[in-house]
C-alpha cells in the first residue's frame, strides 16, 4: 500500500514538473537588448508554491514545513538555532521585527518571519538578517542553493565534457548528478528563468546500456516519462562540433540516431590522423573507443523546439556546451561574510565627504570606435580622430598604442607625439594628421592611468575608405519581353560598402521601384518581367556609407526583343538573400526576396515555427523584411512565398546571428582584507563563444609566468591568494574575445587593513521597540579584517542566550522584547588593528491596536458610493500613518486620475463604483515600531461579466448553433443574451440576435447554447455574446474563432435596373452589382432579359465578364432606334440563380437627327453679340430619332474659310440663341444644327449679318450729385461725343446702389438722348449711403462708366422746424452739409 502511495505521489510530482512554466513567483528583469537573455547575475527566487521544498507531495528527507530550515551548521550551529532571531522585517516599518541599521532607528512588530518568503523582506540598507536567512547567501556569489547544495549554471565559456568537469573541479565542485525529481525540477525552473533556449548544458550522466543512463557518482539518472528527446541534435555545421581539436569528416545524418535502444549512438566517419591523439585525450579510461568511432553517450539539458520544453538529449563528449556544477562543500555560512565584504563600496574605509574627490582608479566611460577615413575627402578634411574617455580621481592621463604584428607576434607600439609631429594626443583624443594607409591603417587602443593603476581600452580599427571610377563604357543589355531580367551594377573597387542607385536616361532620374521593378542591396536592378516601357538607357550610381562621396556609372541601353511567351514563376538568381551576409546582434537585418515571372507576383515572409517578431516589418511591396536591432532570439529559418495567379513557390533562408562579447557578469571593485583571498569572476555572452584573458595594470597575466601559489586563472575566474597591499593594489581587467571583438571589464582591487570605525555607521541614539515584539540592532562598523563583536547593556556584558542573540555579523536580536530590555546598549568591535564602540538607547513602547474597523463585508452596486473608516489607538510617542490598499495595491488620493477615489487619512471614499472596485480593501496603520491591518471584502453588483469560450457547434447557410460559458453574474441573475456578429465583409459589430434565451447544455461548466438565424451565406463570421441582467448589458465576450456559413444562391435581385444610350443598334442595360455579402458564393455573374414594350417573349443573355459587371450591351435591329424596351436582370452564382428584378422600361440607343433647322436669321444684338432665331423643328421620332438635347450654332467671319468656324452649343430646345464674343462691326456667316445623344443633324442654310459698331468708349465727365430732400438727389453730367467707329449715343444710364451691396443690385435710371443732361433719383432711403456711376449707351451696348465712383449719404428728416424770414418751414438737414465724394475706385472705368 505504501509503495502505491509513493508511486502516485511520484506521478503527481512529474505532472507538476511538466507544467512548471506559468508558476513563477516574481517578475523577470528585462532581457538584454542584444542577446535577448536575462542578466546572468540575476538569481531567481521561489515562493512556497514553486519550490520543491514546499511541495506537499515531496517525499524526500527534508521537512515540508515551510518554517523549518535545513539542518546545516552555521558557524557551528544549526540554522534552526538562528531562525527565531531573524523574525521581523529589515528597516523601519512594515511587518517584521525591529532592525536598527544605518539611517534607521526604528523597528517594528510583525508575524513570524518566513526566511524563504521574499515578500516579507524589507529594504533598509544592508540587511544582515536577510544575509543569514536567505539560503542563496550560503553559496558563493553567482551560485544558487537548493537542499543545502550550491549550483552554478556556467554560461561561459563553452567546453567539452571533460574540460567542463575539470572546471567544476577547479571550483571545488563537480558536474551535476541529476538523481531525483526535485533536483530535476529545480534545474528546469532555472533554465526557464534564465532564457537559455539556444544553449545546451552538460550534466555528469552517460549511457551505459540501452535505456540506461548513470551519473558520475554511479547513481541512476532520474527516470521521467517522455523526458528524453532522441531525434533532435546539434547539426554538424554547428560551431560546437568544429572545434580545432578534431575534424569530423562524415555527415551525422548517415547514422540512425533516432533509436533510443541503440547502445551508444555513434558518430560515423574518421578522425583526422593528426588529431587522433587529441581526440583520445578527451576520452576517459572507461570510454569505448574503437574503430575510430566516437559515441553520443553523454547527456545535456536542451530545449526541444518540437515539444516546446526542456528535455534530456544525448550528446557527444566532444561537443562544446555550457554546463552545470554542484557542490555540497561550498554551502557554508562563511560565504555570508564573504559576500558582505564583496559589497563594500569603493569609498569603504575612506574619511572623505566629497564623493567626487574620493580616490579611485580609472574606468572607461567611452571606448574608442572603429573609424573610416575617406581618402576622397582629404582635400577638405585631412585628419582623423580616435577618442576614449575615462573617469577616476586623480583625473587619468592617456597613452595611445598602435597594434602591429612583428614576426607573427602582436606588439603594442607607443605613439609619441613629441617624436612624430603627425600625431597629437589631447585628453583622450588621438589626432592623426595627413593619415596614410600604408602607415596608419590598423588597430589602436588607449591606456588610461592614475596613481592607482592602468587600464587599456578596447581596440579600434582605423580604415581607409575609397571608391574607384567606373569603366567608361559598358555594352548594351538585351532582354525578351515578358521574361524576368537582372542588370548587374559592376561597381568599381570600393571600401567600405556602398549604396546602389539606378538612373534612367539621365541623372538624377532615378528608377522608381514598384511591384515589378526592384533595386537590391546586391547592387542589381531586377525586373519581374520586361515590358516595352523598360526600353531605355540605364546607369548605376554608388555612394559610400561613410560620406557623401559617390560615382556615376556609364549609361548603356537595354534592348527589348518581342516574345509572345511568358516566363513561369521562379525565384530570381540566389534569392532570398540576407544583408549583411554575416549579421551581428544590434544590426538591422534586411531579408530580400525577388521573383521572375508573369503575371506580377506577390510576396509574403514567414518565420518557421514562430510568428514574425515585433521588431520586424515588411517594405517594398512585401519583398523586403526588415528586422530592427536584431538579437540572437531572431535566429531561425525565414521563408519567402511568391504567388501569382498561375503558381506558388516558397524558399527559405537561415539566419545565424553572431554577437560581440557582452558582459553579463562584469568585474566589480573589490576592497579586501590584508592576507585574505579575492576572486574576480567575469562572464560574457558571445557568439561564437568567448575566450578570456586577464590583465593587471594593462599588462596581460600570462598563466605560464605568474606565481601559481598566489594566482589561479581558470578561464573567466581569477583568484589571488594572500593579498598584500604593495603587490596587489592595482587595476584588473577581464578580456572576453571572439572573432568579432575583444571586450574588457575593469575593476580596482584595494587591500585594506584598518581598525573598526563607527564614524559612518554609528548605532542610532534611540531605538524604539514594541512590547512583546522583535527588535534587531545592527552593528555595522567599517573594519578590515572583519572584527569580533561584544555587546553590553547598561555597562554589563551580555551574551548570546535566552531571548537575546548575537549574530556573526554583530547584529543583536531581542525576541520577545520586554520592559526589562530598556537601557543603553553598546556594540564593541575589535580586530588586530584596534577597537571602537557605539551606543544606542532602547525604548520599549506599547503596540498600536484598532479601536474601530470597517465591516467585514460590503455589498454595493455599480455607480454607487463606498465609504470605509478605521481608527487605531497608539502610544503618544509614536507617529502613525494610515495606508489604504485595494487587493494589495496602495491607494493614493485620486488614484486613477478621475477623482473617484478620495483618501482622507483614516477614511476612504470611492465614488461611481465599477466592477473593478470589487475586492479586498485593507486599512493599514503603520508606526515606527509595528503595523496592523484590517481587511474588508467589497462586492459590486452590476451588469454581467463577459462570457467566455464562444464557439460555433454547428453552422449552415443561414443558421448557427453557438455555445459559450457565462462570465460573472455580478450579483444578479442573467435574464437573456444578445449575440453580436461581424463578417469578412463588414468589420463592424452588429446585433445578429437579441433577447436570446439560452439553453444550458453542461451544468458542471454552465455552458450555454443558442441558435442564431438570418445569417448571410458564404460569409466568415465572428461572434460575440453579451449577457443582460436587471442592472444592464454586460461586457461583450472576446470574439469567437472565425466560422464560415455555407454557400447558397443569391437572395435578392440586382437594384437600380435601367439603361439607355450607346451607339445605334445597341440596347444598354445597367444595374447595381450585388455587394460581396449579397453574392452568397463565388462565380457571381448576371443574366439580362429584354423585349420590346408590349411584346410577349423575352430575349436573354448571361454576362460573365468581371471587368464590365453592372453593364450589358445587346444588339437590336438598327431601325429600332430610340424605342422603348422592357428589361430585367437576374444574379447567378455557382450554386444557382437568384430572383429576377422588377421590369424597367428603357430606350434603345438614339440615331442622329435627320432634319435641319429652317430659315435661320441672325440679328445684331450689340457690338459683340448676335441674336439667332430659326423656325422650330418637328419633334417627331422620325425627324429627331431620339430626344432633342439642343442646337449647335456654327459661325465664322465672311472673310475667312468655313473650316475656321467656331461652334456654340445651346443646350435648350428653344428656337433662338445668343452668340457672344464677336468682334464689333464685322460680318459673320451663321448656320444652325439640331443634336441629340447620338450626335448632330444636318446644317441649315447660312445667314450673313454684321455686328454693331463699338459701344461708347468715353465715360461721362463732370458728374455731380445734389441733394433735393432726404429721399431725392439730382445728378448732372457732361455730354459724351462718340468717335467714327462707335455707334451713335442713344442715351444715358444713372446707375445707383447701396454702398454695402454689390453693383449687380444697382438700379438704372435711363435718360434718352435729346433730353437735358440731368436726372432726379427719387425714393432713396434717408440716412443710407449710396454709390453712383453714369454711363452712355448705344446699339453697340453700354459704354464705359464714370470714374471715380461717387459715394454719398442721404440726410435725416428733422421734426423741429426753423422759420425763415419768409415764414416757410424747411428741413434743417436735407443732405449732409456737403455731399461726401469719396474717390474710391471700386470699379474700373468702362
UniProtKB/Swiss-Prot annotation:
A lipid is attached at residue 1362 (GPI-anchor amidated alanine). N-glycosylated. Residues 58-67 have a biased composition (Polar residues). Pfam families: fn3, I-set, Ig_3, UL45. Expressed in ectodermally derived epithelial cells from stage 12. All these tissues, such as epidermis, hindgut, foregut, salivary glands and trachea, which contain pleated septate junctions. Expressed by ectodermally derived epithelial cells and along peripheral nerves. Not present in midline glial cells. Expressed in epithelial cells and glial cells of peripheral nerves. Its main location: membrane. Disulfide bonds join 388-446, 489-540, 593-640, 682-734, 779-827, 870-923. Required for organization of septate junctions and paracellular barrier functions. Septate junctions, which are the equivalent of vertebrates tight junctions, are characterized by regular arrays of transverse structures that span the intermembrane space and form a physical barrier to diffusion. Gene3D superfamilies: Immunoglobulins (2.60.40.10), Mannose-Binding Protein A, subunit A (3.10.100.10). The gene is Cont. It comes from Drosophila melanogaster. Residues 362-463, 468-561, 576-656, 661-745, 756-843, 848-939 form the Ig-like C2-type domain. The lineage of its organism: Eukaryota, Metazoa, Ecdysozoa, Arthropoda, Hexapoda. GO terms for molecular function: cell-cell adhesion mediator activity. It is a lipid-anchor; GPI-anchor. Keywords: Cell adhesion, Cell junction, Cell membrane, Disulfide bond, Glycoprotein, GPI-anchor, Immunoglobulin domain, Lipoprotein, Membrane, Repeat, Signal. It comes from the Eukaryota. Residues 25-67 are annotated as: Disordered. This is Contactin. GO terms for biological process: axon ensheathment; axon guidance; cell adhesion involved in heart morphogenesis; dendrite self-avoidance; establishment of glial blood-brain barrier; establishment or maintenance of epithelial cell apical/basal polarity; homophilic cell adhesion via plasma membrane adhesion molecules; nerve maturation. One of its GO terms (cellular component) is side of membrane. Forms a complex with Nrg and Nrx. Forms a complex composed of septa junction proteins Nrx-IV/Nrx, Tsf2/MTf, Cont and Nrg during late embryogenesis. InterPro entries: C-type_lectin-like, C-type_lectin-like/link_sf, CTDL_fold, FN3_dom, FN3_sf, Ig-like_dom, Ig-like_dom_sf, Ig-like_fold. Residues 1-18 form the signal peptide.
